[in-house]
Swiss-Prot record:
Name this polypeptide is given: TPR repeat-containing protein PA4299
Gene3D superfamilies according to UniProt: Tetratricopeptide repeat domain
TPR repeats (start-end): 100-133, 135-167, 169-200
GO cellular component: plasma membrane
Protein keywords: Cell membrane, Lipoprotein, Membrane, Palmitate, Repeat, Signal, TPR repeat
Species name: Pseudomonas aeruginosa (strain ATCC 15692 / DSM 22644 / CIP 104116 / JCM 14847 / LMG 12228 / 1C / PRS 101 / PAO1)
S-diacylglycerol cysteine lipid sites: 17
InterPro entries documented for this protein: TPR-like_helical_dom_sf, TPR_rpt, UCP029658_TPR
Topology in the lipid bilayer: Lipid-anchor
Lipidation (N-palmitoyl cysteine): 17
Region annotated Disordered, chain positions: 210-245
Signal sequence bounds: 1-16
Amino acid sequence: MKALIGIGLCAALLGGCAALPGRDGPRECSQQLGQEQELQMNMVRDMIREGRLHAALANLESMPPGLLDVREERALILRRIGDPRARAEYQALLETCKAPEAHHGLGLLALRNGDSARAVLELREAARLRPTESRFRNDLGVALLKRGDRVGARFEFITALELQQGGKLPATNLLGLLYLQGDREDAQRLIERLQLDARDIRAAEARARSWGAVPTPGAAPASDDPLAELPAEANMHTAMANEAP
């Protein structure tokens, strides 16, 4: 159990599957945004990061609807606000250079709907098409954990962490999994090596609870951080890269 984390984290600290058939898709986008469109798209993405999803969607309506970037952000917004049109938007992107993002979005939709088997298929395909995308690997780990595959989830969290050196999301997910497994020594080693703070530890504790277990008492220092009180549903969403606020 300790070997994987020891080997996997070594490179990160020193330097900082089944697929769906026939959906390789083009690897590059030929469309390019003009300067004004790029500025508007950046504004839309800022609104999304701020949680102003309806405002972002309204701004997208003033842009050419056929642009792939517009279609991708529209699908993301519709998914986040729970609009059923999101599925069709993602499916329409499967044969474009946005196929990795489309499979990722479809996987998160499946996970939200409780279809963890389909979620794993879609997220595996997203990771196959873009294997170095940290958020795809992280979210695949969450889906695998929902399927009860802790070994697979651990592998994906470590991969995501090494791809995004210093990334708090895969780090806290991995720590949460270690708490879930009762791996106190590995958990403490991870905290020390990555210099995780009390807020990170509380987030990991909350995720471990939402994933089905309470962390071993004494495995982490106490804190008054409000993340410790987040409900299970909120923690499942914040464990996924594209769901974090």
